[in-house]
Protein backbone atom coordinates (compact mmCIF):
# COMPACT_ATOMS: atom_id res chain seq x y z
CA UNK A 1 0.00 0.00 0.00
CA UNK A 2 3.04 2.28 0.19
CA UNK A 3 2.68 3.57 -3.37
CA UNK A 4 -1.07 4.09 -3.02
CA UNK A 5 -0.62 6.07 0.19
CA UNK A 6 2.11 8.21 -1.38
CA UNK A 7 -0.12 8.92 -4.38
CA UNK A 8 -2.97 9.94 -2.09
CA UNK A 9 -0.71 12.23 -0.05
CA UNK A 10 0.54 13.90 -3.24
CA UNK A 11 -3.09 14.42 -4.24
CA UNK A 12 -3.91 16.04 -0.89
CA UNK A 13 -0.93 18.38 -1.09
CA UNK A 14 -1.37 19.22 -4.77
CA UNK A 15 -4.95 19.11 -6.02
CA UNK A 16 -6.67 19.58 -2.66
CA UNK A 17 -4.20 22.09 -1.26
CA UNK A 18 -4.58 20.56 2.21
CA UNK A 19 -2.67 22.12 5.10
CA UNK A 20 0.38 20.40 6.58
CA UNK A 21 -1.59 19.47 9.69
CA UNK A 22 -4.36 17.90 7.60
CA UNK A 23 -1.84 15.94 5.55
CA UNK A 24 -0.12 14.63 8.68
CA UNK A 25 -3.45 13.65 10.23
CA UNK A 26 -4.56 11.71 7.13
CA UNK A 27 -1.19 10.02 6.77
CA UNK A 28 -1.16 8.96 10.41
CA UNK A 29 -4.70 7.54 10.23
CA UNK A 30 -4.08 5.60 7.02
CA UNK A 31 -0.75 4.23 8.23
CA UNK A 32 -2.47 2.93 11.36
CA UNK A 33 -4.95 1.09 9.14
CA UNK A 34 -2.05 -0.20 7.02
CA UNK A 35 -0.38 -1.64 10.13
CA UNK A 36 -3.62 -3.38 11.15
CA UNK A 37 -4.08 -4.82 7.65
CA UNK A 38 -0.51 -6.12 7.54
CA UNK A 39 -1.08 -7.92 10.84
CA UNK A 40 -4.04 -9.61 9.13
CA UNK A 41 -1.86 -10.56 6.16
CA UNK A 42 -3.34 -7.93 3.83
CA UNK A 43 -0.77 -5.87 1.92
CA UNK A 44 -2.68 -5.22 -1.32
CA UNK A 45 -5.26 -2.42 -1.35
CA UNK A 46 -7.45 -4.44 -3.74
CA UNK A 47 -7.96 -7.09 -1.04
CA UNK A 48 -9.52 -4.69 1.46
CA UNK A 49 -13.26 -5.35 1.89
CA UNK A 50 -16.05 -3.67 3.79
CA UNK A 51 -16.00 -6.57 6.26
CA UNK A 52 -12.32 -5.97 6.95
CA UNK A 53 -12.93 -2.27 7.55
CA UNK A 54 -15.87 -3.00 9.86
CA UNK A 55 -13.58 -5.32 11.82
CA UNK A 56 -11.10 -2.47 12.08
CA UNK A 57 -13.78 -0.19 13.54
CA UNK A 58 -14.60 -2.83 16.17
CA UNK A 59 -10.89 -3.17 16.90
CA UNK A 60 -10.60 0.59 17.50
CA UNK A 61 -13.62 0.53 19.81
CA UNK A 62 -12.14 -2.35 21.84
CA UNK A 63 -8.91 -0.39 22.07
CA UNK A 64 -10.89 2.28 23.89
CA UNK A 65 -10.53 4.97 21.22
CA UNK A 66 -12.92 7.90 21.64
CA UNK A 67 -15.82 8.05 19.19
CA UNK A 68 -14.59 11.41 17.95
CA UNK A 69 -11.17 9.90 17.22
CA UNK A 70 -12.69 6.92 15.40
CA UNK A 71 -14.91 9.23 13.34
CA UNK A 72 -11.90 11.30 12.31
CA UNK A 73 -9.91 8.19 11.39
CA UNK A 74 -12.79 6.85 9.31
CA UNK A 75 -13.08 10.17 7.47
CA UNK A 76 -9.42 9.77 6.45
CA UNK A 77 -9.97 6.15 5.42
CA UNK A 78 -13.08 6.99 3.38
CA UNK A 79 -11.23 9.77 1.57
CA UNK A 80 -8.34 7.42 0.79
CA UNK A 81 -10.48 4.64 -0.67
CA UNK A 82 -12.66 7.09 -2.58
CA UNK A 83 -9.49 8.40 -4.20
CA UNK A 84 -8.29 4.86 -5.03
CA UNK A 85 -11.69 4.07 -6.59
CA UNK A 86 -11.70 7.28 -8.60
CA UNK A 87 -8.19 6.55 -9.88
CA UNK A 88 -9.26 3.05 -10.96
CA UNK A 89 -6.92 1.28 -8.54
CA UNK A 90 -9.86 -0.60 -7.01
CA UNK A 91 -13.10 -1.63 -8.72
CA UNK A 92 -15.32 -1.12 -5.68
CA UNK A 93 -15.05 1.31 -2.77
CA UNK A 94 -15.10 -0.78 0.45
CA UNK A 95 -15.45 2.31 2.64
CA UNK A 96 -18.43 3.82 0.82
CA UNK A 97 -21.04 2.54 3.29
CA UNK A 98 -18.75 2.50 6.31
CA UNK A 99 -20.50 4.07 9.30
CA UNK A 100 -18.80 5.93 12.10
CA UNK A 101 -20.00 5.46 15.70
CA UNK A 102 -22.50 8.04 16.89
CA UNK A 103 -20.91 10.94 18.69
CA UNK A 104 -22.64 12.19 21.80
CA UNK A 105 -22.70 15.97 21.74
CA UNK A 106 -21.43 17.27 25.05
CA UNK A 107 -22.65 20.58 26.40
CA UNK A 108 -19.65 22.92 26.38
CA UNK A 109 -18.35 24.18 29.71
CA UNK A 110 -19.21 27.87 29.95
CA UNK A 111 -17.91 30.02 32.77
CA UNK A 112 -20.07 32.69 34.34
CA UNK A 113 -19.02 36.31 33.88
CA UNK A 114 -17.98 36.36 37.55
CA UNK A 115 -15.78 33.27 37.08
CA UNK A 116 -14.12 34.81 34.02
CA UNK A 117 -13.45 38.04 35.91
CA UNK A 118 -11.90 36.09 38.79
CA UNK A 119 -9.72 34.14 36.36
CA UNK A 120 -8.51 37.25 34.52
CA UNK A 121 -7.71 38.96 37.83
CA UNK A 122 -5.25 36.28 38.94
CA UNK A 123 -2.04 37.37 37.14
CA UNK A 124 -0.95 40.33 39.28
CA UNK A 125 1.47 41.68 36.69
CA UNK A 126 4.44 41.95 39.05
CA UNK A 127 6.80 39.90 36.86
CA UNK A 128 7.35 39.64 33.08
CA UNK A 129 5.77 36.17 33.18
CA UNK A 130 2.64 37.43 34.95
CA UNK A 131 2.38 40.37 32.54
CA UNK A 132 2.55 37.92 29.62
CA UNK A 133 0.01 35.59 31.22
CA UNK A 134 -2.38 38.50 31.77
CA UNK A 135 -2.06 39.55 28.13
CA UNK A 136 -2.68 36.02 26.83
CA UNK A 137 -5.75 35.44 29.00
CA UNK A 138 -7.24 38.86 28.24
CA UNK A 139 -6.67 38.50 24.50
CA UNK A 140 -8.07 34.96 24.41
CA UNK A 141 -11.30 35.98 26.15
CA UNK A 142 -11.59 39.28 24.25
CA UNK A 143 -11.39 37.59 20.85
CA UNK A 144 -12.56 34.00 21.32
CA UNK A 145 -9.76 32.71 19.11
CA UNK A 146 -8.49 29.14 19.33
CA UNK A 147 -5.42 28.40 21.43
CA UNK A 148 -3.58 27.32 18.26
CA UNK A 149 -4.34 30.74 16.78
CA UNK A 150 -3.27 32.50 19.98
CA UNK A 151 0.17 30.89 20.15
CA UNK A 152 0.52 31.16 16.36
CA UNK A 153 0.13 34.95 16.34
CA UNK A 154 3.10 36.92 15.07
CA UNK A 155 3.99 40.52 15.76
CA UNK A 156 2.75 41.52 12.30
CA UNK A 157 -0.66 39.99 13.06
CA UNK A 158 -1.59 42.53 15.72
CA UNK A 159 -2.68 46.13 15.09
CA UNK A 160 -2.48 48.01 18.37
CA UNK A 161 -3.61 51.34 16.89
CA UNK A 162 -6.99 50.10 15.70
CA UNK A 163 -7.26 47.14 18.07
CA UNK A 164 -7.55 43.96 16.04
CA UNK A 165 -5.64 40.77 15.31
CA UNK A 166 -5.37 38.78 12.09
CA UNK A 167 -5.68 35.00 12.37
CA UNK A 168 -4.23 33.10 9.43
CA UNK A 169 -3.85 29.59 8.15
CA UNK A 170 -2.69 28.33 4.77
CA UNK A 171 -6.07 28.83 3.10
CA UNK A 172 -7.85 31.75 4.77
CA UNK A 173 -7.59 34.54 7.29
CA UNK A 174 -9.92 36.64 9.41
CA UNK A 175 -9.60 39.79 11.51
CA UNK A 176 -10.97 39.92 15.04
CA UNK A 177 -11.28 43.09 17.15
CA UNK A 178 -10.36 43.38 20.82
CA UNK A 179 -11.34 45.96 23.43
CA UNK A 180 -9.62 48.42 25.76
CA UNK A 181 -8.90 45.97 28.58
CA UNK A 182 -7.11 43.51 26.30
CA UNK A 183 -5.33 46.40 24.58
CA UNK A 184 -4.01 47.69 27.91
CA UNK A 185 -2.74 44.22 28.85
CA UNK A 186 -1.10 43.83 25.44
CA UNK A 187 0.59 47.23 25.66
CA UNK A 188 2.03 46.32 29.04
CA UNK A 189 3.34 43.02 27.67
CA UNK A 190 4.89 44.55 24.56
CA UNK A 191 6.38 47.53 26.40
CA UNK A 192 7.83 45.90 29.50
CA UNK A 193 7.80 42.09 29.41
CA UNK A 194 8.32 40.59 25.96
CA UNK A 195 11.87 41.89 25.46
CA UNK A 196 12.93 40.49 28.83
CA UNK A 197 11.41 37.08 28.08
CA UNK A 198 12.99 36.95 24.60
CA UNK A 199 16.44 37.71 25.98
CA UNK A 200 19.02 37.38 23.20
CA UNK A 201 16.65 35.52 20.89
CA UNK A 202 15.06 37.17 17.87
CA UNK A 203 11.47 35.99 17.81
CA UNK A 204 8.68 37.02 15.43
CA UNK A 205 5.95 35.18 17.35
CA UNK A 206 3.93 37.40 19.66
CA UNK A 207 3.93 35.19 22.74
CA UNK A 208 7.07 33.50 24.03
CA UNK A 209 7.90 31.30 27.00
CA UNK A 210 10.44 32.10 29.71
CA UNK A 211 13.27 30.84 27.46
CA UNK A 212 12.32 33.16 24.61
CA UNK A 213 10.94 30.32 22.47
CA UNK A 214 7.45 30.09 21.00
CA UNK A 215 4.78 29.35 23.60
CA UNK A 216 3.41 25.82 23.22
CA UNK A 217 -0.16 24.59 23.61
CA UNK A 218 0.88 22.52 26.62
CA UNK A 219 2.63 25.52 28.15
CA UNK A 220 -0.46 27.69 27.89
CA UNK A 221 -2.68 24.84 29.13
CA UNK A 222 -0.59 24.71 32.34
CA UNK A 223 -0.85 28.49 32.72
CA UNK A 224 -4.63 28.38 32.44
CA UNK A 225 -4.92 25.47 34.90
CA UNK A 226 -2.74 27.34 37.39
CA UNK A 227 -4.83 30.51 37.36
CA UNK A 228 -8.08 28.56 37.26
CA UNK A 229 -7.05 26.87 40.50
CA UNK A 230 -6.08 30.20 42.09
CA UNK A 231 -9.45 31.66 41.07
CA UNK A 232 -11.28 28.81 42.79
CA UNK A 233 -12.97 27.65 39.59
CA UNK A 234 -14.20 24.12 40.27
CA UNK A 235 -15.04 23.01 36.72
CA UNK A 236 -12.30 21.55 34.54
CA UNK A 237 -11.30 24.41 32.26
CA UNK A 238 -9.35 24.24 29.02
CA UNK A 239 -8.28 26.97 26.57
CA UNK A 240 -11.45 26.20 24.60
CA UNK A 241 -13.53 27.02 27.71
CA UNK A 242 -12.69 30.70 27.27
CA UNK A 243 -13.68 30.48 23.60
CA UNK A 244 -17.03 28.95 24.57
CA UNK A 245 -17.51 31.57 27.29
CA UNK A 246 -16.64 34.42 24.91
CA UNK A 247 -19.29 33.28 22.43
CA UNK A 248 -21.97 32.56 25.03
CA UNK A 249 -21.49 35.88 26.81
CA UNK A 250 -21.62 37.84 23.54
CA UNK A 251 -24.82 36.15 22.40
CA UNK A 252 -26.44 36.48 25.83
CA UNK A 253 -25.72 40.22 25.60
CA UNK A 254 -27.61 40.41 22.30
CA UNK A 255 -24.74 40.29 19.80
CA UNK A 256 -25.60 39.44 16.19
CA UNK A 257 -25.26 35.70 15.57
CA UNK A 258 -23.59 36.17 12.18
CA UNK A 259 -21.06 38.61 13.65
CA UNK A 260 -20.15 36.10 16.35
CA UNK A 261 -19.87 33.37 13.70
CA UNK A 262 -17.40 35.53 11.75
CA UNK A 263 -15.29 36.29 14.82
CA UNK A 264 -15.13 32.62 15.79
CA UNK A 265 -14.33 31.53 12.24
CA UNK A 266 -17.19 29.02 12.13
CA UNK A 267 -18.00 27.89 8.59
CA UNK A 268 -21.47 26.72 9.66
CA UNK A 269 -23.89 29.00 11.55
CA UNK A 270 -25.35 25.94 13.30
CA UNK A 271 -22.08 25.58 15.23
CA UNK A 272 -22.49 29.11 16.59
CA UNK A 273 -26.18 28.60 17.35
CA UNK A 274 -25.40 26.02 20.03
CA UNK A 275 -24.69 28.96 22.36
CA UNK A 276 -28.30 30.13 22.08
CA UNK A 277 -29.22 27.79 24.93
CA UNK A 278 -26.97 29.76 27.25
CA UNK A 279 -28.78 32.98 26.34
CA UNK A 280 -32.17 31.40 27.02
CA UNK A 281 -30.89 29.98 30.30
CA UNK A 282 -29.56 33.31 31.53
CA UNK A 283 -32.67 35.21 30.44
CA UNK A 284 -34.82 32.94 32.59
CA UNK A 285 -32.83 33.59 35.76
Regions found by a protein language model. Name each.
Residues 1-285:
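Conserved catalytic core of the tyrosine transesterase superfamily
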Amino acid sequence: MENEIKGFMDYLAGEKGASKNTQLSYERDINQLKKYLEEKGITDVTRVTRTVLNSYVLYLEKEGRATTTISRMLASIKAFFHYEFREGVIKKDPAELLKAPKIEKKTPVILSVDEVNRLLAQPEGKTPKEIRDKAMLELLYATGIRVSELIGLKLDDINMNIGFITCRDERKERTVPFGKTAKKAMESYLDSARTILCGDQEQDHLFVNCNGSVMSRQGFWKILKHYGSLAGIEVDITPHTLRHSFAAHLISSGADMHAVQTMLGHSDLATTQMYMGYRQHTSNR
